[in-house]
Amino acid sequence: LYSTTDPKQIISTIKKRYKPSIIYIADLDAIIDNKVNTKIINDILIDFPEINFWIDTGLNILKSKKRFMNYHSVFCTENSIGFDIDSNNKKKYVCSFDYKKRILGNVNLPRLLKYLPKKIILMDLEQVGSSKHANFKMLRKYIKYSTKYELYIAGGIKTTLDLNRAKSLGARGVLVSSILKKDCLPRLLIQKRKNQPTN
């Protein structure tokens, strides 16, 4: 799919082919070494204002050039020592529940509920980047919260059957890096997405 390692060129390719409204970015340097790729992220936010970016910097602060309307910080439970989120800024945040047979981090879900933003990613780390399929058992476990929160599933989405099953179970959306990497989305679905008006 990509003939480059330049993030901006990759995003341009994805934008042209799939017309996404949201792109998730995990800054691995920030997550692993606490070194945020500030310049690259700022450049991306400037160059693609029409796309909303969910960006995981491992709870590190991004020093942005300005207040970007398309920047949404991702908070992950795996690195949490018991965080809450300012209720005044919930709309700009996304919470990722990192899951490995249980939610990782110092998280008491019932106590945390009142602090959570509307958008929540259920990310099964055992499925991410693996040959395993999505953990729909995890989704069914937490789907009771879908009336109040928008649930997105990550890890193991390999086919359009997985997409349809996630939707039927109540997921608001999915992270689909494996499908894009393998170029598995059918042309009809791509064309349908391209024909949709931009929000």
Model-derived segments and their meaning:
Residues 1-4, 76, 84-86, 90-100, ...:
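Active-site pocket-lining/capping segments in soluble small-molecule metabolic enzymes
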Residues 31-53, 140, 150-151, 171-178:
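Short, electropositive alpha-helical surface patch
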Residues 59-62, 70-85, 124-129, 156-189:
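Glycine-rich phosphate-binding active-site loops on the catalytic face of alpha/beta enzymes
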Residues 19, 48-50, 66-74, 88-94, ...:
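Glycine-enriched alpha-helix->loop->beta-strand junction motifs that scaffold or abut catalytic
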Residues 1-49, 66, 95-134, 158:
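Conserved N-terminal beta1-alpha1 strand-loop-helix module at the mouth
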Residues 23-25, 53-57, 73-75, 93-97, ...:
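Hydrophobic faces of well-ordered beta-strands that scaffold small-molecule active sites
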Residues 41-42, 91-92, 110-113, 138-140, ...:
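Short, hinge-like loop/turn segments at secondary-structure boundaries
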